[in-house]
Swiss-Prot record:
Pfam family, one: Ribosomal_L5
Organism for this UniProt entry: Corynebacterium glutamicum (strain ATCC 13032 / DSM 20300 / JCM 1318 / BCRC 11384 / CCUG 27702 / LMG 3730 / NBRC 12168 / NCIMB 10025 / NRRL B-2784 / 534)
GO molecular function, one term: structural constituent of ribosome
Official protein name in the record: Large ribosomal subunit protein uL5
Sorted UniProt keywords: Ribonucleoprotein, Ribosomal protein, RNA-binding, rRNA-binding, tRNA-binding
UniProt similarity note: Belongs to the universal ribosomal protein uL5 family.
């Protein structure tokens, strides 16, 4: 990225969203205004215990989606029922921060989520009590970076958005302002 480029969503957060949140929650200090710290994208590949080539597909997909090489996750303990031994690769994860994080969030909200068939919005009940939000996607084909003809199998992923919000209400308000399409009480998307 060039030196003077600032991601679109980051600019919107700094110019509009911070002021709205300050007015909504009446923070005394600007450092109390919630922001996004990092995004963790995790892809678990449990079948990699039987076929080690499957983990390579997950790594390639995550690299294409996030633009960053994923970290290989290995099993911490052996579990005989799953035919799993300690140290076997069972997943991959990427931690995005800074401009890459803002770009990924922008692509996720404007391109990927609207491409999901029969998408009615994300549940707003998946906060962890400290303003962090985790949701899962069932397949990786909704991202334009993935060539549908070249994928060997559909893989789901978990995406965690870590914020500096203290409560779930602050985190929910921040993500709603950023453009997260949360479901309403009736199960349909809120406007």
């Amino acid at each position: 990225m060039t030196e003077n480029y600032i991601p679109r969503l980051k600019t919107r957060y700094q110019d509009e969203i911070r002021t709205k949140l300050q007015g909504e929650f009446e923070f005394e200090n600007v450092m109390q205004i919630p922001g996004v710290t990092k995004i963790v994208v995790n892809m678990g590949v449990g079948d990699a215990a039987r076929d080690s080539k499957l983990i390579n597909g997950a790594i390639e997909d995550l690299t294409a989606i996030t633009g960053q090489k994923p970290q290989l996750r290995r099993a911490k303990k052996s579990i005989a029922n799953f035919k799993l031994r300690e140290g076997m690769p069972i997943g991959a994860k990427v931690t995005l921060r800074g401009d890459r994080m803002w770009e990924f969030l922008d692509r996720l909200l404007t391109v990927a989520l609207p491409r999901i068939r029969d998408f009615r919005g994300l549940s707003d009940q998946q906060f962890d009590g400290h303003g962090n939000y985790t949701f899962g996607l069932t397949e990786q084909t909704m991202f334009y970076e993935i060539d549908v003809d070249k994928i060997d199998r559909p893989r789901g992923m978990d995406i965690t958005v870590v914020t500096t919000a203290v409560t779930d209400d602050e985190g929910r308000s921040l993500l709603r302002e950023l453009g997260f399409p949360f479901k309403g009480e009736d199960g349909n998307r809120q406007q």
